[in-house]
């Protein structure tokens, strides 16, 4: 039997910073070139027309336009940017 109670330190107490992932611009919204559409881990949503992929799988608009989500297959989605006239995005 131990004569003193063991002084153990907690093995918890760690947490990672939030990564703020998710959809940032929804379907039908106007975006400018370079706007982030989706922050994600892996390719949960595939890039469609006029959408680029960042180093961390961030999807962003390559042109000014309107965001459109659609189904890539039965289980996967894709996001595209439909270009619009310059007068519409200037307002």
Swiss-Prot record:
One of its GO terms (biological process) is translation. Keywords: Ribonucleoprotein, Ribosomal protein. Residues 1-24 are annotated as: Disordered. The keyword Ribonucleoprotein applies. GO terms for cellular component: cytosolic large ribosomal subunit. Coiled coil: none annotated. InterPro entries: Ribosomal_bL27 (IPR001684). Pfam families: Ribosomal_L27 (PF01016). The keyword DNA repair does not apply. It comes from the Bacteria. One of its GO terms (molecular function) is structural constituent of ribosome. NCBIfam families: L27. Belongs to the bacterial ribosomal protein bL27 family. HAMAP family: Ribosomal_bL27 (MF_00539). This is Large ribosomal subunit protein bL27. It comes from Chloroflexus aggregans (strain MD-66 / DSM 9485).
């Amino acid at each position: 039997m131990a004569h003193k109670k063991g002084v153990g330190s907690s093995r918890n107490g760690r947490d990672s910073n939030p990564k703020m992932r998710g959809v940032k611009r929804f379907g039908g919204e106007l975006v400018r070139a370079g706007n982030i559409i989706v922050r994600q881990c892996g390719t949960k949503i595939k890039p469609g027309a006029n959408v680029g992929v960042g180093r961390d799988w961030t999807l962003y608009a390559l042109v000014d336009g309107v965001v459109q989500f659609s189904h890539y297959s039965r289980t996967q989605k894709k996001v595209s940017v439909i270009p619009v006239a310059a007068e519409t995005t200037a307002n």
